[in-house]
């Protein structure tokens, strides 16, 4: 077993954790840059320079014609993100939130469970990151204006978005990444993950209610909010693209079309519509849309892929894989996935586990996917969504400390994950 690639990878991961906790952004004039991808990119470059990964290895991995090509996976994720971000740019999600709050604010119980249902439904067909970015500011402002405790609603939002994101392949980049490695089609994935996701979600909701039911008893005097108007033509086109893409993805295996190609086609079609509509209306809708795409995931995922290649070449992943496969695979990969994601973040965890799962059972793959989603609400390190969530709450003067987040995360996350793993373990 080679030691150098393990040492370099370990140092990179330690600096990654430090960057997430202590210096998540750096300022260059008026521009703020995330540091997480810079750290991993430096680590990847060092590994290449030290010849822990050969150029031939990179060519074979990045330009392979299989579905495990990381570039194809990134195209799939960015394309799907563009469809959701466009609807958010139009104001659809904030409109729905305001509409719901104005009509169902009779008491906090109705509001709490109603928001949970809406956030869960929207997460299933869009993306957990988009929901977090949209609903966190809304809930902070809503709770402040109505003088109610924001913590139950914010924790509910985060738990709902990061549990229901497991049910469809499009809900999280980790779902896309791991399922692509094992050629799982849309419907096969859904049929296998539906019951574990529902089990985890029901468990999480019950625990949320037990923790916060006293706070929800407080009276609510809702202040009516004006609902923003949405232009109908862009909204219709945006929804048609999202629904059409989701439907075609669900039957992609029968059409013998790769999912990344379907998503890219819908994304390019939407971009063309936005450009033409913007020109006709003398507006600029394309630039805000392009700015909000998570471009920093490209160097991050590719760099982590280099780290995993180096660890694979060192022989470490083979040793770990053989060790994990000798035990109960659902439990081993599930709980180790939770721990790993909260040490190095869920995207690097997914990249690492793609190597560990090479000879594992399909249930182990699904357990790893479920872990990569639920890990997000155990600690803020577990996912990029956690970092965004903490930054957004701080900007809106809602204080949720790291310790508070972890306390509720462990209380809710571990039982939810256990329910999901057990459902997966005993399913035929």
Task: Specify the residue positions occupied by each region the protein language model found.
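Membrane-core helix-loop-helix motifs of multi-pass transport proteins
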Residues: 1, 146-214, 219-230, 236, ...
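Hydrophobic transmembrane alpha-helices of multi-pass small-molecule transporters
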Residues: 1-85, 195-201, 205-313, 408-428
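Cytoplasmic-side transmembrane-helix entry/capping segments in multi-pass membrane proteins
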Residues: 31-41, 98-102, 107-109, 114, ...
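Re-entrant/interfacial helical elements at transmembrane boundaries that shape
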Residues: 96, 130-141, 154, 168-182, ...
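Alpha-helical transmembrane segments of multi-pass membrane proteins
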Residues: 108-120, 147-164, 328-339, 359-380, ...
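Residue-level recognition of transmembrane alpha-helices
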Residues: 116, 137, 158, 171, ...
